[in-house]
Amino acid sequence: MAFKSGFVALIGRPNVGKSTLMNYFVGKKISIISPKPQTTRNSIKGILTLDDAQIIFIDTPGVHPPKNKLGEYMVKVSEKTLKEVDLILYIVEAIDSGIGPWDEAILEKLKEVQTPKILVLNKADLASKENIEILKSLFSGRLSFEFIIEIAAINGYNCDVLLEKIKKLLPEGPKYYLDDMTTDVRESFIVSEIIREKILLNLSEEVPHGVGVSVERFSEREDKDILDIEATIYCEKESHKAIIIGKGGQMLKKIGMQAREELEMLFGIKVNLQLWVKVKKNWRDDIAAMKMLGYNLKEV
């Protein structure tokens, strides 16, 4: 049997399960999950290697009108990804009542690319068969799809069927990554994303969008099984800094505790996590600051 390989983009509006699906296929947490828009800022790769295929999933930033240079970067990353991959998974919620504004924008973008597409109806376990059939008809009337698959990424329902359809559409090709690799991003990047996820989950809508995380130290002690991590949380306003720190430092302590617990599970080692908060005004419009915070502007 010929070996298949290729790059698969995941696109969809916020909170439809893109990151959950990629993390499910890869078998570990690669991409952070949050109900807030613009959670994913970079194209994050999750690598699944099987006996007969290697699939590189790419969780793309959402398609949205940019409000600053960071927003422009995210849109460019998403558009570039859609043009370069072998297959696009367009993910929508099976419980949706119709095609909303976010999906209208995504459909328009997808019309511009000739890449094969699969429509994935996620959260099918929560939807009626009638609603699923209505959505299939609505979306297939707007765009041509190779397959339409209903799944539940949270528990893996029908994901095996989706996987087989993905393999069917991928070209024959080589292994691009070693068998044991599940992502190509640095460990320090995953650390910064997990910290940012905890900020997204704990704070109100306004603050998280202006937050970036820089990991200054990531080192394992020679004499003890302890991983020392030092990171700085950057925000754009003094008022946001006060909110992140919280009364008596309680919010920062909560964010740090949640991040540390997840990092210890991820790395299988005790983690000593130190967090600081600094203000860098308008960093999302500052190219140098964006580079410092890990946004690879050369990609776009």
UniProtKB/Swiss-Prot annotation:
Its main location: cytoplasm. GTP binds at residues 12-19, 59-63, 122-125. InterPro entries: G_ERA_dom, GTP-bd, GTPase_Era-like, KH_dom-like_a/b, KH_dom_type_2, KH_sf_prok-type, P-loop_NTPase, Small_GTP-bd. One of its GO terms (biological process) is ribosomal small subunit assembly. Residues 38-42 are annotated as: G2. It holds the Pfam family KH_2. Residues 4-172 form the Era-type G domain. It is found in: Cytoplasm; Cell membrane. GO terms for molecular function: GTP binding; GTPase activity; ribosomal small subunit binding; small ribosomal subunit rRNA binding. GO terms for cellular component: cytosol; plasma membrane. CDD domains: Era, KH-II_Era. Keywords: Cell membrane, Cytoplasm, GTP-binding, Membrane, Nucleotide-binding, Ribosome biogenesis, RNA-binding, rRNA-binding. Residues 12-19 are annotated as: G1. Residues 122-125 are annotated as: G4. Belongs to the TRAFAC class TrmE-Era-EngA-EngB-Septin-like GTPase superfamily. Era GTPase family. PANTHER family: GTPASE ERA, GTPASE ERA, MITOCHONDRIAL. Monomer. An essential GTPase that binds both GDP and GTP, with rapid nucleotide exchange. Plays a role in 16S rRNA processing and 30S ribosomal subunit biogenesis and possibly also in cell cycle regulation and energy metabolism. This is GTPase Era. It comes from Caldicellulosiruptor saccharolyticus (strain ATCC 43494 / DSM 8903 / Tp8T 6331).
